């Protein structure tokens, strides 16, 4: 099925769900589009349901993505700290260095999720901005997805007259709503059993360390 949720910002870090719509779809199988017309129809009907009880017009959406095409790996990068004090540009450079890995031509990077930073062998740093040192390292979790899977979903959404602001890995989106910061810090495995796939995310020491997709579901 296709589910549309409309939320309103309560504050900078939380949303209030104000409306929801859902509609079964035969156009999706194991998280990917197998029929453009059927998927477009289900998206439109779920949007109509959600907007029926919402005062306003939805113009853009974030789309959850899953499927057996999802890949992930842990990577790291190292750069020199230009002025001996970490600036935002240094963080950008070390993240870019971490994601400079070879991926298949039919895949694209979906998320670059920082796990920790290291400054001159001092590890477990969450926010390096402003700290002193000469060498900055980043450890990140990279998530990639198939180009055609993204393109097909985006095509279906745009056929409904809606723009796409971005794509979010479904288990990552679920983690924001069901896991506390304490749980992520202590270590937790999230298992999201959907209609087409079972999505897994493992958190430890406050950051994500593993994501996976099993093409079997409820």
Which residues are covered by each model-predicted region?
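Nucleotide/phosphate-binding catalytic cleft detector across ATP-hydrolyzing
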Residues: 5-190, 207-211
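Glycine-rich phosphate-binding loop of actin/hexokinase-like ATP-binding domains
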Residues: 186-218
